[in-house]
Amino acid sequence: MAAWGKKHAGKDPVRDECEERNRFTETREEDVTDEHGEREPFAETDEHTGANTKKPEDTAEDLTAKRKRMKMDKTCSKTKNKSKHALRKKQLKRQKRDYIHSLKLLNVLEEYITDEQKEEEEEEGEEEELIRIFQEQQKKWQQYRSVRRERLKEMKLLRDQFVKALEDFEDLCDRVFSDEDSELDN
């Protein structure tokens, strides 16, 4: 092993074995060329024959991986559908609740409006009743005043007649007394 202060030169063989090989990024130039850089003939490599070069174990692993992916996709799809269904159900429930609350609010508002209209009509009726009562009282007062005026006129006439009668009686009494005085003087 390398000392603590020194850097490790070269590749780590353990790490090299653990790395997975990606078939899309591999160049495989080392398989095609020999150590001097010359190309080897195509007949010696399976890569250029056009045949499937995978081993049966690799194919089985690929199939099991594909099955696992399909199974995961299926479970994800089921979960997604369940969540969509639950979300839709929750939305419908919320819409139904909102609709019911809206209906209740509408009913309450209608009741409030009808109550307000009734109260307004009652107030108008009370006002009309008060106006009618006031007008009746005013008529009665006017009748009372006209009757009083007539009575005052009659009383004034009676007073004038009484005063005239008193004056006539006084004149009569004065004449009678003056006649008696004159007879007594004679």
Curated annotation (Swiss-Prot):
Belongs to the XLR/SYCP3 family. Keywords: Chromosome, Cytoplasm, Meiosis, Nucleus. Residues 66-93 have a biased composition (Basic residues). It holds the Pfam family Cor1. May play a role in meiosis. This is Protein FAM9B. It comes from Homo sapiens. Expressed in testis and ovary (at protein level). It is found in: Nucleus; Cytoplasm; Chromosome. Residues 10-27, 34-58 have a biased composition (Basic and acidic residues).
